[in-house]
């Protein structure tokens, strides 16, 4: 039974549950996106992921790549900007694109409220 002091707790995020469910969901989304475009994880030079949780991003990248990602393959801006919601992946892209060269492929992926997720495959032009 809810009491008056609990009014601010009508909506509670179940962080561990979200983590367990979002990691495979996003990894599968990226893998499907790559497959739909006849690409493999090995084709990716970089993954700019939603900047909410470093551990979550590390596991997503590991599932997609089949190994631990390097810091250049999956950069983070969490230490500098914290969680900026859906803007995080674009901020990471902006801050970590200078050594992304012509012809290289990457994926930008954001995910969040309501288990929404989206990705875009990018190829650096000449």
For each feature predicted by the language model, list its residue ranges:
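Glycine-centered flexibility sites
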Residues: 1, 15, 82, 88, ...
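Hydrophobic pocket-lining "lid/loop/helix" segments that shape and contact the acyl-thioester
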Residues: 1, 5-77
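Short alpha-helical patches at coil-to-helix transitions and adjacent helical residues
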Residues: 23, 54, 83-90
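Conserved beta-strand-centric core segments of catalytic alpha/beta enzyme folds
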Residues: 26, 90-126
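Charge-rich, low-complexity amphipathic helices
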Residues: 56, 66, 71, 82-83, ...
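A generic structural signal for well-ordered alpha-helical surface patches
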Residues: 58, 62, 79, 87, ...
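Short alpha-helical interface elements
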Residues: 58-62, 69, 85, 118-121, ...
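Cysteine-centered functional microenvironments
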Residues: 73-88, 109
